[in-house]
């Protein structure tokens, strides 16, 4: 276990330590007739890449934009993580959850990017871009998501992370005459898929001047909350690696890769190891087999998928600082109330409480890594969800 402090910014700019002894879709009915009409058009499924037509809360066209400091020569320093011996000051891993500031982009931003390829490891896919730094790709990522119907919830260039707002894939809603009529009179919003998606986008500086880009999908589904089916609630839904792949393919094309080439890269099947060779649970820890660098990359994406948002990381100390995602059902409800609340103009949700932070320690061991969950003071995390979190992480990494 590391004896060096590991920390990030808080109100008192304190440090935290890890010590040697620590162990580690449906359409909601307005009336029966509407439900029948909607369901009648909802048959069949696609085996090809899904149709995508996302809309966020703003419902507005957003022009290609560039962060205000794109041309700032010091911007590249935002991506440097603290390394070396000694204490890691809290300010080194300060969260920068700032609202997006929009500026028109120069035409040069749209020039094709050379050397883009899709890598795959099990169900995980990511892009590798040669010769481009995260600072150069950042404005393209931001513009890409906005042009695909997602508002940006937060962006943290210091750790290369961007998070979208929840959005609905309107392509899943049947295109019938009644819906078109409602759209014309401004009531198209009462149609809903009962599903919402969001993405956590991560970009990291890789070896030999490459940038690695990851898209982690999160989903929510609206279900009936009682036997009488008079209320609905939002529940987490499994992440969809195929949807991640679809957007990675789109981003490849956005960077100038030929459409057919991008789709062929996405469809290529990897060589998978046996099911039990990649990870297993041992007590209160998770053993992940294989190359340490590969395991580190896979763990980052897995943490995003299971609701532990990485807000700081230090490869020298083998540690991630993570924050539990707020109650996602509250977040979706605040953004998109249920049908009857939308019709009545009600349903404003309370602001979610700040979530606790944890340390995910990835200790190098023979033939792999040992992952444990810790409190910020370095003690073993013993929350009631500890086993569930470890199990979810195992499901992503096995």
UniProtKB/Swiss-Prot annotation:
InterPro entries: BamC_C (IPR042268), NlpB/DapX (IPR010653). It holds the Pfam family Lipoprotein_18. It comes from the Bacteria. Present in outer membrane vesicle formulations which are used as vaccines in human. This is Uncharacterized protein NMB0928. It comes from Neisseria meningitidis serogroup B (strain ATCC BAA-335 / MC58).
């Amino acid at each position: 276990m590391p004896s060096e402090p590991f920390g990030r910014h808080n109100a008192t700019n304190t440090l935290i330590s890890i010590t040697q002894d620590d162990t580690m879709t449906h359409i909601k009915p307005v009336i029966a007739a509407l439900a029948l009409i909607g369901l009648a058009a909802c048959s069949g499924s696609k085996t090809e890449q899904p149709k995508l037509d996302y809309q966020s809360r703003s419902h507005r066209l957003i022009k290609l934009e560039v962060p205000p400091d794109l041309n700032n020569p010091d911007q590249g320093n935002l991506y440097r993580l603290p390394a070396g011996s000694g204490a890691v000051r809290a300010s080194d891993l300060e969260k920068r959850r700032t609202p997006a500031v929009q500026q028109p982009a120069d035409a040069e931003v749209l020039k094709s990017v050379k050397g883009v390829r899709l890598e795959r490891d099990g169900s995980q896919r990511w892009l590798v871009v040669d010769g481009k730094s995260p600072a150069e790709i950042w404005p393209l990522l931001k513009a890409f998501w906005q042009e695909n119907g997602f508002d940006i919830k937060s962006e943290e260039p210091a750790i290369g992370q961007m998070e979208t707002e929840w959005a609905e894939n309107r392509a899943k809603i049947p295109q019938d005459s009644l819906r078109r009529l409602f759209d014309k009179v401004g009531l198209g919003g009462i149609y809903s898929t009962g599903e919402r998606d969001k993405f956590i986008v991560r970009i990291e500086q890789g070896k030999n001047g490459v940038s690695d880009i990851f898209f982690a999908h999160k989903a929510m589904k609206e279900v009936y909350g009682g036997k009488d089916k008079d209320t609905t609630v939002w529940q987490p839904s499994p992440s969809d690696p195929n949807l991640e792949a679809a957007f990675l393919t789109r981003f490849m094309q956005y960077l100038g890769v030929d459409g057919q080439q991008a789709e062929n890269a996405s469809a290529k099947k990897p060589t998978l190891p046996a099911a039990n060779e990649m990870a297993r649970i041992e007590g209160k820890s998770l053993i992940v087999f294989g190359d340490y660098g590969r395991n580190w990359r896979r763990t980052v994406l897995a943490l995003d998928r299971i609701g532990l948002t990485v807000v700081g990381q230090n490869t020298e100390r083998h540690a991630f600082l993570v924050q539990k995602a707020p109650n996602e059902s509250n977040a979706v409800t605040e953004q998109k109330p249920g049908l009857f609340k939308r019709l009545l103009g009600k349903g404003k949700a309370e602001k979610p409480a700040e979530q606790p932070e944890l340390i995910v320690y990835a200790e190098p061991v023979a033939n792999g890594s040992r992952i444990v969950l810790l409190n910020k003071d370095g003690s073993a995390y013993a929350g009631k969800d500890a086993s569930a979190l470890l199990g979810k992480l195992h499901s992503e990494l096995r």
